[in-house]
Amino acid sequence: MLDFMDYIQLAFAEGTNWNRDNSYSSLTATAQSLLDFSTPERLRVHLSSLSTPNFATSYTLGTVGLIDGSVSYLYSTVPFTNTPSRSALIPLRKLSPGYRQVTPPSAPIEDWNLDSILDNPQNVQPSFASKPTLLHATLHLPPPTTLNALFLRRISPTMHLTLAVCSTRGPPLSKSAPQASLLTQLSHDTGKYSNEYLFSTDNALFGWRGLWNFGPDPRSATDTAAPRLSLLSAGAEAYYSPVSSLIGMSTGLRFSTLPAATDVPASTATGSATANQSTPISTFPYTLTLTLTPLTGSLSTTYSLRASPNLAFSSRFGFNVYSWESEMVAGCELWRKSRKQDDGLEWARRKMRASEPLSLPSLPAESTERQEEEEATDSVLKIRVDQSWNVRVLWEGRVKELLVSAGVGLGPSSFSSSSWAAAAAGSGQSSGGGVPSYWRGVGVSVLYSS
């Protein structure tokens, strides 16, 4: 489950119309959400609040061997007036990433008044307030204290600047300066393609990521153009560090159906619709990815599909051409939808929908109905298993005013010293290997926000 601050950052991206799917770093985001989710460690409590439309705070207390915690603050020039902040009102699908429908690429919005300094230099607010900006800082306690800071800024309709700082305080008796690193990322998204330029002070690492979308350019699209049914994207990334002589690169492909492929097309104005026009192009959304890392010889393919609004599956197969090692992972998620109270008027609604003219558009109603179904879900169950029978089970749901996340990890490769000691004492053995224990760990995370 995402933290409250991550949820606010996603709301900032949506509020500034930034398409996070049009990035090479999000090429396998759907498969990672279904296969690489993490389970909570021990007990952790999150208390968060959106005290003003522009300011949020969050406090975390956890017990992972030792008691630890963190304090977070966030400020944004974009007000979150319409963003649900109470834990009882936040849609669970916003906090629990699962199968995500890829957003179609769109042309950047040009009406930001970014050139107001040249047009009317006398009536101009400070540039800090004219462009969407977000500041976020988290202090992790107890010592060694770690400070994480984040700076986000939309410098233009197509440019996005990110500065991330991580500083760790040394031991109490150490006189050395705190270890710190800075990561700078400049993103450029035109809808047709996107580029990301990265630099990290850690080993002076330089990086580049790019993504290209096949098909028409959204900047030259017209209002009468038919919606796209699918999207094919190709991307690559490269890294180089002159200090450590580190070189890395990868490339990948992604094919995904778009929302228009699973929607039932609207009927013609004359009311005569053929059989092909009354059925969707695809019965369910799906996403295919292929990634290749030439230097290490790693090849990975994923296939994710949403069989129903409340059920999704995903699988991944990896192979290394140098070591001949392979990996196979499968996972699924099952959403539980809360039952709506029956007011006895459903028969009237069905009769009214049946009597509507065929020429009325159906897409807005379908999108509204789909959104209502997603907001009505109150729990999700995720299961993941690999070829070594390592199993992770995660349940996330709403309990009264709280958002609860509980998970357990099972696997044959872990060993328990206590179980080995008990077995050795009972059998009289003084040496030997440990008894395998399938119990890897269990944890519960509780989130409350106001």
Swiss-Prot record:
GO terms for biological process: establishment of mitochondrion localization; mitochondrial genome maintenance; mitochondrial outer membrane translocase complex assembly; mitochondrion-endoplasmic reticulum membrane tethering; phospholipid transport; protein insertion into mitochondrial outer membrane. Keywords: Membrane, Mitochondrion, Mitochondrion outer membrane, Transmembrane, Transmembrane beta strand. It is a multi-pass membrane protein. Belongs to the MDM10 family. Component of the ERMES/MDM complex, which serves as a molecular tether to connect the endoplasmic reticulum and mitochondria. Components of this complex are involved in the control of mitochondrial shape and protein biogenesis and may function in phospholipid exchange. mdm10 is involved in the late assembly steps of the general translocase of the mitochondrial outer membrane (TOM complex). Functions in the tom40-specific route of the assembly of outer membrane beta-barrel proteins, including the association of tom40 with the receptor tom22 and small TOM proteins. Lacks alpha-helical transmembrane segments, suggesting that it resides in the membrane via beta-sheet conformations similar to those predicted for other outer membrane proteins and porin. This is Mitochondrial distribution and morphology protein 10. It comes from Aspergillus flavus (strain ATCC 200026 / FGSC A1120 / IAM 13836 / NRRL 3357 / JCM 12722 / SRRC 167). The gene is mdmB.
